[in-house]
Amino acid sequence: MEVSTDQPRWVSHHHPAVLNGQHPDSHHPTLGHTYMDPTQYPLAEEVDVLFNIDGQGNPVPPYYGNSVRATVQRYPTAHHGSQVCRPPLLHGSLPWLDGSKALSSHHSASPWNLSPFSKTSIHHSSPGPLSVYPPASSSTLSAGHSSPHLFTFPPTPPKDVSPDPSISTPGSTGSTRQDEKECIKYQVSLADTMKLESSHSRSSMASLGGATSSAHHPITTYPPYVPEYSSGLFPPSSLLGGSPTGFGCKSRPKARSSTEGRECVNCGATSTPLWRRDGTGHYLCNACGLYHKMNGQNRPLIKPKRRLSAARRAGTSCANCQTTTTTLWRRNANGDPVCNACGLYYKLHNINRPLTMKKEGIQTRNRKMSSKSKKCKKVHDNLEDFPKSSSFNPAALSRHMSSISHISPFSHSSHMLTTPTPMHPPSSLSFGPHHPSSMVTAMG
C-alpha cells in the first residue's frame, strides 16, 4: 500500500485490534479501510467510560452507569476532536441514497471509528460520500447502547441534510456551521414528527369519549353539552314514574285502539285491541269477530251461566245440607259425599256445618290474576312512591355520577372523562362505601 505525500502519515498505520480479516465487511471487494494513528487513539479511561472496552479493544464490564456515560459523551475532549476515520458506504443499491445526500455507516467494527463529536472531516479516497453527523437517533443509541453498531439508518430519507462538506470544501468553517444548522433542523423536524404521531394516537383514544384533540393540544377538552346517558346507567323511564319496562313484565294491558266513529255492530263496543269485519263489511270488536269466525254465529250479548265442574252427579246430594250442586265433592269421616262447603267446615271445626249457613248461590272467587301480575303491581306501586322531585336535580345527578364514574374504562385518566364532575361537592352530599381509589378517581 502506497501512501501519497498529501495524505497524513497516520493513514498508513494499522491498529492491531482492527484487522482486515476481523472486519465484518472485509469480504466486500469495493470497501477500503483507513485507520487512526496510535497516538490519536482515545485514552484507556475514556474508552472504558464511553464504550465498555479497554485500550486493546477487549470488552469489559461497564465501569460507569449509562447516565454517567451519556454525560461524558455530551462533551467532547480535546485529545481526539478532529482526527476521525470513517469507513466508506456499504452498498449503493438503496433506493433513496444518492451522491448528493450524506449518510453515516451502519456497520463499524471499532466503536471510535464513528464519533459524534468531530466537527471537521478528513478528505480521503472513499468510493462514496460520507457524513460527519450521525442520524438523529444516534444520540439516544450512543448513551445507552454498548453494541459496536452505534448508529442505524433513519427510517425515512433525510431530505433536509446538506451534502457532505468533506466533498465540497474540506476546510471551510462556514460549511461546517451550515451542516450543523441543517443537522439540528433535521433533528427538530424528526421530533415534531414523533409529537404528531403521539398526538394522533391520543386523539384516536380521545374520540371514544366524544372529544377531539390536535397536535398542539393533546389534552382533550370537555364537550359543550352533557351527552345522553345510555340505558345501562339508568333504568329506562322508571325514575320518571313511567311504566317499568326494564323489569320484563307488563303492568297494564295493551293499548286499546279506538277510531272515531267505529262501533261494534254486535255489542256496541267503541274500543278494542283490534277491529275486525264480518261478512258484510261491518266493524266488529276483537271478541265478537273471533267468536263469529270460530262459531259461525254472532257472539251472545248475555253471559252464559258458568258451568260447574263435577257439580251435578246423578243422584248425588250432600249428606249434611242435601244440596245437589257444588264446585267440589268431598267425603266425611263415614265416607258419605258432602259438598265443598260442608266438607271444609267439618275439616276446620270438627263439627258439622249448621244448616242456617246454607246459601242458594255458590260464592266464587276471581282467580284470573296470576302471581306475575301481583309482582308487577307491587313493583309499580313502589316506583310511584319514589320521589320524582329528586330524580334529576343537580345534587342527585352529581352524586350519581361520582358514584358510578369508576365504571368508565377511561376513568384512570382525568382528561379522558367525557362529562365534568364537581371538584368540591356540597357538604350535604354523602358518598356510599366505595373503594378509596375509585373515589379519588371520581373526584378527578
Swiss-Prot record:
InterPro entries noted in UniProt: TF_GATA-2/3, Transcription_factor_GATA, Znf_GATA, Znf_NHR/GATA
GO BP term, pick one: male gonad development
Molecular function terms from GO: cis-regulatory region sequence-specific DNA binding; DNA-binding transcription activator activity, RNA polymerase II-specific; DNA-binding transcription factor activity, RNA polymerase II-specific; DNA-binding transcription repressor activity, RNA polymerase II-specific; E-box binding; HMG box domain binding; identical protein binding; interleukin-2 receptor binding
CDD domains hit by this protein: ZnF_GATA (cd00202)
Gene3D superfamilies for this protein: Erythroid Transcription Factor GATA-1, subunit A (3.30.50.10)
Cleavable signal peptide: none
Start and end residues of each stretch annotated as Disordered: 1-29, 123-181, 195-215, 362-390, 413-444
Pfam families listed in its UniProt record: GATA (PF00320)
Tissues in which the protein is found: Expressed only in definitive (adult) erythrocytes within the red cell lineage, and is also abundantly expressed in T-lymphocytes and brain.
Zinc finger boundaries on the chain: GATA-type: 264-288, 318-342
Coiled-coil region(s): none
Subcellular location: Nucleus
Biased composition (Polar residues): 201-215
Its job: Transcriptional activator which probably serves as a general switch factor for cell-specific development. It binds to DNA sites with the consensus sequence 5'-[AT]GATA[AG]-3' within regulatory regions of genes.
Record's protein name: GATA-binding factor 3
Native source species: Gallus gallus (Chicken)
